[in-house]
C-alpha cells in the first residue's frame, strides 16, 4: 500500500555550505530587503540583476505567478483576504526560478543552474546571500551566460528547457500535465508560525512556488486548489506512527472530496515520526479516489530542503521508487537526486525516476491530469468531445446518442451521475458496482483493474513486478506486463506446434544475417549482429511443423528456416524457423525477436535484445513486503495484488482481494481456508448430533456409547489400573460384618455399632490422651429367633437343654459370646474376629539357648555394628537375702497365692461411688435384612459344608 522505503532524515555529516554575498538591483538601483518587497508589491513583473563579488552578473526576469492557486481559493471569502500576490517565477534556459517576497525577513528564492542550485535569503545585517546546495562554491555558471540573451528571448521560454538532461526528452512525450493539489496544515504547523493564519498561508504558497520549480523539467504544473489550516486542533489523530497517521488522513481526504475536487491531497505537520521518517505516501496512486496522497514533515527551517521532501513523496504518488546507490544502474547528474532514500538538498530527477514516471503515464496513471485548473467555464467549448471546466459531460460535435448527457448544454440529464468512462454504466447512468472488471488482464503477467463503485474512471494499468517469475512458469520472467516465454511466443507465431528451437540455433544470431541477428535499425534498415553474450536475446529461433506462420497478414511478414547439427556426426539435424514482420518500429519491438524477460543464462534475462543480470533489474524495481505472505503477487509499483479474502500492503489482513492500485477485486471476502474448516466442522457436528438423536429416539440405541466402545477396543484404550483403598467408616457408623460362610455365597451379615475410643467432644490438644490398648473384645452374634441355636460355641446336650430353658423365660434379644475357635476335632478353627484359621494344638515351647550361644551371638552383633564387646568371666555377686517375715498380726494382710506382698500401711480409701447409668429399657434395633437372613441359618448344614471344604 505504501512506499516500503520511507524518506528518512539524512545520516550524513552536517552540511556547512559557504554563504555567497550578492547585490540585487532592479532598474539599476540597489535593493534592500524592504525596498525589494515594496517593488514586488507595486510591480507584477520586474527584471532582477544579481551581482556577485567575483564580477559575475546574472539577469533574470520575474513575473508574478498567479497559477499557484485557482480562482475558487481567491474568491473564497475565508481565504481571499489571506492571498498574497508576492510569489514570482522566472524562466530561463536553466529552468524555472522561484522567488517569494512576502516579508522582508522571510525572503526565499531558488535559482537554477546547469550544475548547481542556489537558495536566496537575507543575512542578519540586511544584505542578500546565495547558499549553494550542490557544489559548495559561488560560481553562478550558466546563469552568467544566459544573462547575455535578450529579455524577449528569455521570456518566451515556456516549455521544457533544452538544458534539461537528455534522458528526460527521451522518455517523456512532451505533453503538459496539471496536478490539482489539496494541502492541509495541522495544528502543530499553525503554532509553529505564531498561530498567524496569514503566515501559514504565505508559507504554503511559498512551498507551492518552489515545488513547481522542481517539477518544471518534467512538464508538470502543480496548482493549489484547496487548503486547510487546523487552528483549533487536529481533525484527525496525528501520532508518531506514520503509517497510522497516513491511514487516518486518507479517510479525512474522502470527506474533503465531497465538497472539493482535487487529484491528490497532502498533510503537512511538524510532528516527528518514529524511526526518523519525514514522509510517507502511497505509490502509483495518482488520480485514485481512496489512496492518492501522503504526509510529510516540516523538519527544517530551510524551506527548500523541506519542499524537496514534499517533492519526494509526491514522486511516490506518481509511481517513482527510491533511487539505488549504484550509479551504473541509475544515472543521476548530481551527487543526490530527489528520489534518494535520505532527505537533503535534492533538486534533480534521476534517470530511474523519469523512467518510472514515463511507465506510469503509459499505463494511464495521468488520466485526471489533462484538465487545466483555473480555466474559466466561459472558456469551455461544448461539443468538442473534451470534458472541460464547467462541463459535466461532452458527447462530441456530432449527434449525441448518449441518453445520460445533454449534447447542447454538456450537462447530465435528470438523476444521471456519469455519462462516460469505463466504470460508467450507460444504461443506468451511474457508476458500475464495486469490483466490476473495467480492464481485463491481457496475459499472465498482467493484472485486472476494477471499478471502485464511486467514480466513472478505471484505474491505471498495473502488472506483475518486473523480474518476477511468470505465474505457473519456470525460468521465465515477467517484464512490463509480458511474460518472456519463448515457447509461448513461438506458439503465437507458428501455431500449436510451435516451440522454442534448439540451443545451437541461437549461435546464428552472431552472424548478423536474415537467419540470425539482434534486430534491424529502424532508420537505416541495417541488420545488427549480436554479441556472443547476447546471442540468446536476438532473433527468436523456433521449431514447428507448420508450413507458414499464423500471425500477421501474409503480405507483411517474412519467414525462413535454416539447419543446424548438434554433433559432428551430422545425424541429428535440427530446423530453425525465424520470423520477420513490418510491425516492429521505434516504440514496439518486432514480434520475431526474443521477448523481454526470457532467460539467457543463470540469473540472467533478456531486455531489449541484451542479456542483463536479474539482480540489476531487481535493484530498480519496487519490492513488496514479506513476499505478500504467499497470498498474492507483487505489482510493478511495489504493492501486493492479493487473493480473495486478503488485503493490505502484504496481504496480511482480511480483505476483498486486489490491491490499492487496481481496487478491490471482490464484493465479499468469500470463504477462506479457516472459514471453510469452521463451516465444515459445524455442519459435521450438526449431522452427527441429528444422527445420534434419531437412533436414540427411533431405534433406542446410544451411538456415542457404541462408538466409544469400538474405539476403546480398537486402540486398546483403558484407564490406569490403580487399586483404590476404601476409606474407613466414620464414627458411629453402621459396620456390616460378613459371616464366615460368605466365601461360599452364603452371606449372613449383621450390623453392629462401633464405639469411639475417646469422647466425641475431645478435639482439642488438651483432651488428647495416650493410646490405650484394651484386650480384644469377644465377638458377638446377634440372634433374634430363640428357636435357632447359635452356631458357636458347640455345646453338649445338657448345656443345650439349659440354654433352651433360659430362652423360653426371656423374650428380648440377647447377645451371646462367640468362641474364638471351634471346639471340634478338626485341625484348625476359624476366628470370626480376625477372619483366619488358627491351629487347635499349642505350639511346642522354644528352649532358651545356652550362655555360650548367646555370648557368640552378642559378639557377632557387636562386630557387625562396630561396637565394643567385653566378655564377663568373673562370677556375678549373689543377690541380697530376702528380709525375714514378720509374724502375722490381726491387721496384717494375708497373702493371696503368694503372688504379691501387701504393704503394711492401710490402703487408700476407695473412690466415691457413682451411680451406674440405667440400662435402656428399649431393645436394640436390629436390621430387618439381618433378621431375615438369620431365620434361614441352619447350623448343621453349615457345619457339613465347612467339613467338606476342609477335606478338599
UniProtKB/Swiss-Prot annotation:
Alphabetically ordered keywords of this record: Cell membrane, Disulfide bond, EGF-like domain, Endosome, Glycoprotein, Hydrolase, Lysosome, Membrane, Metal-binding, Metalloprotease, Protease, Transmembrane, Transmembrane helix, Zinc
What terms describe the molecular function in GO for this protein?
metal ion binding; metalloendopeptidase activity
List, for all copies, the residue spans of the domain called Peptidase M12B: 177-373
Instruction: For this entry, list what GO says about its biological process.
Output: membrane protein ectodomain proteolysis
Which one Pfam family would you cite for this protein?
Disintegrin
Recorded E.C. number(s)? 3.4.24.-
Name the cystine pairs.
287-368, 330-352, 332-337, 438-458, 624-634, 628-640, 642-651
Its placement in the membrane is given as: Single-pass membrane protein
The glycosylation sites annotated in the UniProt record are: 125, 301, 406
GO cellular-component term (any): endosome membrane
Which protein are we looking at? Disintegrin and metalloproteinase domain-containing protein adm-2
Amino acid at each position: 500500500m505504501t512506499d516500503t522505503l520511507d524518506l528518512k532524515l539524512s545520516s550524513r555529516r552536517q552540511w556547512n555550505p559557504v554563504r555567497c554575498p550578492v547585490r540585487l538591483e532592479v532598474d539599476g538601483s540597489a535593493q534592500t530587503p524592504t525596498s525589494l518587497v515594496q517593488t514586488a508589491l507595486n510591480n507584477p513583473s520586474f527584471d532582477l540583476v544579481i551581482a556577485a563579488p567575483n564580477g559575475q552578473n546574472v539577469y533574470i526576469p520575474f513575473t508574478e505567478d498567479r497559477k499557484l492557486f485557482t480562482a475558487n481559493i481567491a474568491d473564497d471569502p475565508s481565504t481571499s483576504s489571506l492571498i498574497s500576490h508576492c510569489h514570482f517565477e522566472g524562466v530561463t534556459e536553466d529552468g524555472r526560478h522561484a522567488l517569494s517576497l512576502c516579508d522582508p525577513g522571510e525572503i526565499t528564492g531558488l535559482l537554477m543552474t546547469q550544475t548547481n542550485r542556489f537558495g536566496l535569503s537575507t543575512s542578519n545585517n540586511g544584505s542578500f546571500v546565495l547558499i549553494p546546495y550542490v557544489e559548495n562554491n559561488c560560481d553562478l555558471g550558466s546563469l552568467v551566460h544566459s544573462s547575455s540573451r535578450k529579455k524577449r528571448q528569455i521570456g518566451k521560454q515556456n516549455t521544457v528547457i533544452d538544458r534539461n538532461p537528455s534522458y528526460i526528452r527521451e522518455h517523456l512525450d512532451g505533453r503538459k500535465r496539471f496536478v490539482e493539489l489539496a494541502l492541509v496544515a495541522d495544528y502543530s504547523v499553525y503554532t509553529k508560525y505564531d498561530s498567524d493564519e496569514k503566515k501559514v498561508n504565505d508559507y504554503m504558497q511559498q512551498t507551492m512556488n518552489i515545488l513547481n520549480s522542481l517539477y518544471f523539467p518534467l512538464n508538470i504544473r502543480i496548482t493549489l486548489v484547496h487548503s486547510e489550516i487546523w487552528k483549533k486542533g487536529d481533525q484527525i489523530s496525528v501520532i508518531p506512527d506514520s503509517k497510522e497517521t497516513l491511514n487516518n488522513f486518507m479517510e479525512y481526504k474522502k470527506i474533503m472530496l465531497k465538497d472539493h475536487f482535487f487529484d491528490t491531497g497532502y498533510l503537512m505537520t511538524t510532528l516527528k515520526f518514529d524511526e526518523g521518517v519525514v514522509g510517507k505516501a502511497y505509490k502509483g496512486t495518482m488520480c485514485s479516489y481512496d489512496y492518492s496522497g501522503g504526509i510529510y514533515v516540516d523538519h527544517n527551517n530551510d524551506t527548500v530542503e523541506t519542499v524537496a521532501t514534499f517533492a519526494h513523496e509526491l514522486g511516490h504518488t506518481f509511481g517513482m521508487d527510491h533511487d539505488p546507490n549504484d550509479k551504473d544502474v541509475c544515472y543521476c547528474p548530481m551527487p543526490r537526486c530527489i528520489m534518494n532514500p535520505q532527505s537533503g538538498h535534492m533538486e534533480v530527477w534521476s534517470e530511474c525516476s523519469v523512467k518510472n514516471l514515463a511507465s506510469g503515464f503509459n499505463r494511464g496513471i495521468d488520466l485526471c491530469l489533462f484538465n487545466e485548473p483555473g480555466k474559466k467555464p466561459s472558456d469551455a467549448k461544448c461539443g468538442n468531445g473534451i470534458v472541460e471546466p464547467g462541463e459535466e459531460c461532452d458527447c462530441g460535435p456530432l449527434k449525441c446518442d448518449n441518453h445520460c448527457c445533454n449534447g447542447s448544454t454538456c450537462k447530465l440529464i435528470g438523476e444521471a451521475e456519469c455519462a462516460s468512462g469505463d466504470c460508467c454504466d450507460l444504461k443506468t447512468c451511474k457508476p458500475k458496482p464495486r469490483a466490476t472488471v473495467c480492464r481485463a488482464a491481457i496475459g499472465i503477467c498482467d493484472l485486472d483493474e476494477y471499478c471502485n463503485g464511486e467514480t466513472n474512471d478505471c484505474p491505471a494499468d498495473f502488472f506483475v513486478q518486473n523480474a518476477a517469475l511468470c505465474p505457473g512458469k519456470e525460468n521465465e520472467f515477467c517484464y512490463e506486463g509480458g511474460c518472456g516465454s519463448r515457447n509461448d511466443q513461438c506458439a503465437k507465431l507458428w501455431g500449436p506446434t510451435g516451440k522454442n528451437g534448439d540451443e545451437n540455433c541461437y549461435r546464428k544470431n552472431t552472424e548478423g544475417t536474415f537467419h540470425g541477428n539482434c534486430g534491424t535499425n529502424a532508420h537505416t534498415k541495417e541488420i545488427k549482429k549480436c554479441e556472443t553474450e547476447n546471442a540468446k536475446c536476438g532473433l527468436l529461433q523456433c521449431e514447428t511443423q507448420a508450413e507458414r506462420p499464423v500471425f500477421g497478414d501474409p503480405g507483411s511478414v517474412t519467414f525462413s528456416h535454416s539447419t543446424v547439427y548438434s554433433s559432428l556426426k551430422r545425424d541429428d539435424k535440427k530446423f530453425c524457423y525465424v520470423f520477420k514482420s513490418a510491425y516492429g518500429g521505434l516504440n514496439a519491438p518486432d514480434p520475431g525477436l526474443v521477448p523481454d524477460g526470457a532467460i539467457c543464462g543463470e540469473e540472467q534475462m533478456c531486455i531489449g535484445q541484451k542479456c542483463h543480470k536479474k539482480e540489476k533489474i531487481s535493484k530498480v524495481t519496487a519490492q513488496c513486503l514479506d513476499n505478500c505472505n504467499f497470498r498474492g503477487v507483487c505489482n510493478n509499483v511495489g504493492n501486493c495484488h492479493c487473493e480473495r479474502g486478503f488485503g493490505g500492503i502484504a496481504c496480511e489482513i482480511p480483505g476483498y482481494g486486489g490491491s490499492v492500485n487496481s481496487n478491490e477485486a471482490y464484493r465479499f471476502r468469500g470463504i477462506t481456508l479457516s472459514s471453510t474448516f469452521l463451516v465444515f466442522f459445524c455442519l459435521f457436528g450438526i449431522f452427527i448430533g441429528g444422527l445420534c438423536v434419531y437412533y436414540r429416539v427411533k431405534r433406542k440405541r446410544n451411538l456415542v456409547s457404541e462408538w466409544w466402545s469400538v474405539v476403546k477396543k480398537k486402540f486398546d484404550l483403558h484407564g490406569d489400573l490403580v487399586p483404590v483403598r476404601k476409606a474407613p467408616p466414620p464414627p458411629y457408623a453402621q459396620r456390616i460384618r460378613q459371616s464366615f460362610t460368605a466365601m461360599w455365597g452364603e452371606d449372613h451379615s449383621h450390623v453392629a455399632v462401633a464405639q469411639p475410643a475417646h469422647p466425641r467432644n475431645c478435639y482439642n490438644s488438651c483432651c488428647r490422651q495416650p493410646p490405650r490398648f484394651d484386650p480384644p473384645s469377644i465377638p458377638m452374634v446377634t440372634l433374634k429367633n430363640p428357636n435357632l441355636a447359635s452356631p458357636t460355641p458347640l455345646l453338649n446336650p445338657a448345656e443345650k437343654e439349659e440354654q433352651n430353658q433360659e430362652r423360653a423365660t426371656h423374650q428380648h434379644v440377647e447377645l451371646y459370646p462367640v468362641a474364638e475357635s471351634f471346639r471340634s476335632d478338626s485341625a484348625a478353627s476359624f476366628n470370626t474376629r480376625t477372619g483366619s484359621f488358627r491351629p487347635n494344638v499349642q505350639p511346642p515351647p522354644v528352649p532358651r539357648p545356652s550362655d555360650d550361644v548367646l555370648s557368640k551371638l552378642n559378639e557377632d552383633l557387636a562386630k557387625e555394628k562396630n561396637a565394643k564387646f567385653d566378655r564377663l568371666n568373673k562370677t556375678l555377686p549373689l543377690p541380697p537375702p530376702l528380709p525375714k517375715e514378720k509374724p502375722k498380726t490381726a491387721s496384717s494382710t494375708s497373702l493371696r497365692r503368694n503372688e504379691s506382698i501387701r504393704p503394711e500401711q492401710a490402703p487408700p480409701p476407695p473412690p466415691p461411688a457413682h451411680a451406674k447409668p440405667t440400662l435402656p429399657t428399649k431393645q436394640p434395633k436390629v436390621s430387618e435384612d439381618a433378621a431375615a437372613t438369620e431365620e434361614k441359618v441352619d447350623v448343621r448344614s453349615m457345619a457339613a459344608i465347612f467339613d467338606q471344604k476342609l477335606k478338599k
